[in-house]
From Swiss-Prot:
Protein name: Large ribosomal subunit protein uL11
NCBIfam families: L11_bact
Top-rank taxon, per record: Bacteria
Gene expressing this chain: rplK
Protein's UniProt keywords contain Ribosomal protein: yes
Taxonomic lineage of the native organism: Bacteria, Pseudomonadati, Spirochaetota, Spirochaetia, Brachyspirales
Entry's Gene Ontology BP terms: translation
Pfam families to which the protein is assigned, alphabetical: Ribosomal_L11 (PF00298), Ribosomal_L11_N (PF03946)
Matching InterPro entries: Ribosomal_uL11 (IPR000911), Ribosomal_uL11_bac-typ (IPR006519), Ribosomal_uL11_C (IPR020783), Ribosomal_uL11_C_sf (IPR036769), Ribosomal_uL11_N (IPR020784), Ribosomal_uL11_N_sf (IPR036796)
Keyword Ribonucleoprotein tagged: yes
GO cellular component: cytosolic large ribosomal subunit
Family the entry assigns: Belongs to the universal ribosomal protein uL11 family.
Gene3D superfamilies in the record: Ribosomal protein L11, C-terminal domain, Ribosomal protein L11/L12, N-terminal domain
Amino acid sequence: MAKKVVGIVKVRIPGGEATPAPPLGPALGQKQIQIAAFVKDFNAKTSKMKGQLLNTYITVYEDKTYTFVTKGTSTSTLIKKKLGIEKGSGEPNKTKVATINQKQLEEIAQEKMAYMSANDIEAAKKIVAGTARAMGIKVE
């Protein structure tokens, strides 16, 4: 019989660098998960992705065990890294902070493809382009 899920915790944690400090510690503490054990497991599994901010989904079961899945770096983080900018625009419809071309969109889409609901690279590029526009980045 399957274990009963009592909660799912969604956090963004740097790969290989998880610590019991906020936001992770309080989020897991509320679900009564052994924080030190999770940190050790997470850092071991994500050591090759050191420093990348990973979207992580932690499923907590009734017997206080857990499983976790990492979904890669957020699209906005990849766009900022690719364009070398600190942050998006505060007024995306009025102020453009950078320009992204089709080649850059495709590179980001290739990297995110495994975590997206897109069926092909063109659909993934459209998703990435939408994120870029929402950040105040002009899409060429």
